[in-house]
Amino acid sequence: MQQQHLFRLNILCLSLMTALPAYAENVQAGQAQEKQLDTIQVKAKKQKTRRDNEVTGLGKLVKTADTLSKEQVLDIRDLTRYDPGIAVVEQGRGASSGYSIRGMDKNRVSLTVDGLAQIQSYTAQAALGGTRTAGSSGAINEIEYENVKAVEISKGSNSVEQGSGALAGSVAFQTKTADDVIGEGRQWGIQSKTAYSGKNRGLTQSIALAGRIGGAEALLIHTGRRAGEIRAHEDAGRGVQSFNRLVPVEDSSEYAYFIVEDECEGKNYETCKSKPKKDVVGKDERQTVSTRDYTGPNRFLADPLSYESRSWLFRPGFRFENKRHYIGGILEHTQQTFDTRDMTVPAFLTKAVFDANSKQAGSLPGNGKYAGNHKYGGLFTNGENGALVGAEYGTGVFYDETHTKSRYGLEYVYTNADKDTWADYARLSYDRQGIGLDNHFQQTHCSADGSDKYCRPSADKPFSYYKSDRVIYGESHRLLQAAFKKSFDTAKIRHNLSVNLGFDRFDSNLRHQDYYYQHANRAYSSKTPPKTANPNGDKSKPYWVSIGGGNVVTGQICLFGNNTYTDCTPRSINGKSYYAAVRDNVRLGRWADVGAGLRYDYRSTHSDDGSVSTGTHRTLSWNAGIVLKPADWLDLTYRTSTGFRLPSFAEMYGWRSGVQSKAVKIDPEKSFNKEAGIVFKGDFGNLEASWFNNAYRDLIVRGYEAQIKNGKEEAKGDPAYLNAQSARITGINILGKIDWNGVWDKLPEGWYSTFAYNRVHVRDIKKRADRTDIQSHLFDAIQPSRYVVGLGYDQPEGKWGVNGMLTYSKAKEITELLGSRALLNGNSRNTKATARRTRPWYIVDVSGYYTIKKHFTLRAGVYNLLNYRYVTWENVRQTAGGAVNQHKNVGVYNRYAAPGRNYTFSLEMKF
């Protein structure tokens, strides 16, 4: 019976790997009834599992392309929807800045595609006195999910696998190949997906073509997406909103009369003074508009967003006759645009703003006087850059972001299924990747309501204004990688050995350009009438003025070499890096598995700017894990690992405050992870509970070196990015899947339940004694504790299925938002990350699919089925001090409400 037992195990694992690969390797035999079967052969493509790279699988999640389709993943926010402890970092303008894991985020969570690091979150300091908190995008390019074969999410230090950036975790994507589209036993394949998401009116259309002729094969995927902003719950935007707008009214003063010279026949003062006009002054008028059209800090709805994405992936190759050797190429081009308007900026002037600006500017010649019946022409005040701006026009603030990724490369792959040579698998690849983030800020004051992004000042629109500011950040990599795998036995011990090597030449470049303003003036002068001396503005002696056509003035704001935000000198950092890693996962019979890995990284950076903190860094990372199997139904697991993050390019450039800063030595950030788990497994499925402890040290923040002078602490040198903090967190993670037919065989086959839970607790936060003007580390990046419970059914033949998910989130812990700031005088003050925190919430989602004749699959989902109104911490976190583009002066938090009941539909076709 032993042979039949092994056969049942193989079939069961195959079905579960298709349904939920994250748990596939833990499921044991026993779900089928005992019966004698004929010998058959089952061929299946190998699915990536949690324990492929690390023996314990602790902190790992794996999602395949099939999983992404079943979970209806259409964007970055859908990817981790049901995975507690992993959250998307909102960039504040529609894009994202990577992920947050275990209290860290952005550049402290590695993001790679086929081993290629994606662009860093680069936050440049903003202009003083402006509405922005960052001068650059701060985003990280998003991945096209229709190109993804599998994604592995690792929670906890993981630099032995992913290198720099995997301080708190990593997210690693693997790109599809032709085999993922070509069906078994076929020479070609076509896949198409059409999907609609109601939460953002998103439309996705993707088509994949693959073919094989002899040894030649190719894959082509094109994906297009369009979407808007994520719409808040309908209750959040109900009603109308009112605001004050400055409108012209006649001046009540008896000395406010005037005559315009060009409006008098023959330009004769005496013939016109009997019909003078009166100056205008500003008065607030209360106006009411829909919540969608309202502008100001009390806006109920999110800023409007227009999102578009176009992606091409082409992967040709040739497989030699013996199937062991493959040579191929890859070409990828993805462009995403995020165009948004910041509607928290009031479109219209108010009397308070008008008077304050006029007072600051002093007396403005011609204020109150206008030509013809155009009374708005007499209302203008002081604006930016010395320009005069009129109350006639509305202000619009727009951010246009374009993320462009280009990649092309070559690869050689050796696969030996017989495992009878020096390597079972070898891959040599070379990739050139360039990613650019073009962030264009535009401020217009030249259209009636501020909604026209394309309006510009002109001579016929006096007191109109426009400002442009563009920051383009790019990174390029030329990466050579080699990977080798070999399985072998020694003394009845099974070894799975892998070796990875890499060499990279990289460049980082930030360009500040198109930084200028335009404004339209008008010709104005006060005249003395020939026969009336010194008119005083009363009705009998009105002022005699000339109001003529205007002209457009353009002024450059860009400067060079002044070390402030207005410095448009290009920033360039380049260098090289290499790594070598070895890992061996050992099976010690049926009782234990042991694994260990070691990795060495070297990076050297250079810059023509002597103030850039370049240098050489050498780091050593390692991990070790063990799985004890005292019984068939029980695994005891434990792993330790380290992580590091090298200084980012923004940190190396430093903080510039007008003086020539000195380069400083910045060490890598370090982390140490300990994790222990227990796994129960059997016919019923599996259940895993784990405890983790993550310690972070040498965290990099902006501040000063401290020194003691005359018995008092004071700052030393210039502000810079320094190693200054350490922190420690602990937590628990639970996940599992229950097969109800395995629990009780009288229940129909196909019913299952899933469960996931994550909680993080802050244990310690410290600051180095030789640092000052430092903000203590605020853990706004921690996702509140969350439970996710699911109940589903998959028809055994895979024809149809339905799934319900309950998500419950606890409130954000206030203690994670409280901290202190060390002041320059040696004292400190209490600080708070943000003024608000989220309350507990829960939602119910239902989704299902139906397959027609194996070629067509209809999928549908109803999210927030009960139409519950709630706010996620990820949204509110955009108001926190650690946000990339912090939302300031928020009056109403309705705009952060999550969507109400919404629907997603998709049609998939596979041939």
Swiss-Prot record:
Motif TonB box boundaries: 38-45
Cellular compartments annotated: Cell outer membrane
Name the UniProt record assigns to this protein: Transferrin-binding protein A
Natural source organism: Neisseria meningitidis serogroup B
Keywords, comma-separated and alphabetical: Cell outer membrane, Membrane, Receptor, Signal, TonB box, Transmembrane, Transmembrane beta strand, Transport, Virulence
Domain of life assignment: Bacteria
Main location: membrane
Domain named TBDR beta-barrel: residues: 187-911
GO CC annotations, alphabetized: cell outer membrane
Membrane topology: Multi-pass membrane protein
PROSITE patterns cross-referenced by the UniProt entry: TONB_DEPENDENT_REC_1, TONB_DEPENDENT_REC_2, TONB_DEPENDENT_REC_3
Signal peptide residue numbers: 1-24
UniProt xrefs under InterPro entries: Plug_dom (IPR012910), Plug_dom_sf (IPR037066), TonB-dep_rcpt-like (IPR039426), TonB-dep_rcpt_b-brl (IPR000531), TonB_box_CS (IPR010916), TonB_Hb/transfer/lactofer_rcpt (IPR010949), TonB_lacto/transferrin_rcpt (IPR010948), TonB_rcpt_b-brl_sf (IPR036942)
UniProt short sequence motif TonB C-terminal box, positions renumbered to this chain: 894-911
Gene from which this protein is expressed: tbp1
Induction details: By iron starvation.
Record family assignment: Belongs to the TonB-dependent receptor family.
Extra remark: N.meningitidis cells will only bind to human TF, not bovine or porcine TF, explaining at least in part the bacteria's inability to cause infection in non-human hosts.
Span of domain TBDR plug: 51-176
Gene Ontology MF terms: ferric iron transmembrane transporter activity; siderophore uptake transmembrane transporter activity
Function: Neisseria acquires iron by extracting it from serum transferrin (TF) in its human host. Acts as a TF receptor and is required for TF utilization. Binds both apo- and holo-TF, via the TF C-terminus.
Subunit structure: Binds both human apo- and holo-transferrin (TF), via the TF C-terminus. Forms a large complex with TF and TbpB.
